[in-house]
Each structure stands twice: as structure tokens, then as C-alpha cells.
């Protein structure tokens, strides 16, 4: 069974999904960023971004980073 992400941050069609895993050295987070698009009636995802996606991409990544930092500060 695939593990579900613990947080999803979305701005427009840019989405970041954050996963949490426990390792020997402690808690680790990883982030996958995708751009959503429609191909006819079907929604798909891409890991490629155009020039106009970059401002939103920067904001989504910053929010993901902030969320991860806040998790590390919680007891």
C-alpha cells in the first residue's frame, strides 16, 4: 500500500505534496511538486514547469519549507 502524503499545498495549478518518514537518524520530510493540467476531460500531472509557473512554484516551495520547519518545532 502506498503511503499518503501528510500535507498538500496548492496555489492555482501548482501543488506540493509533503511526505513524512521515520529513519534511524530521526524524522525526515520529502516534497514532490507537480503542475496540474487537463488533457481533454482527464486531469494529469507534470514535473515540468513553464516560465509563467515559476512565481507560483517559488511560493508553493516556500510554504512547504515553512510547514516542515513548523513541524520540527512542535513537541
What role is predicted for each listed range?
Residues 1-75:
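Single-stranded nucleic acid-binding surfaces, predominantly the OB-fold ssDNA-binding core
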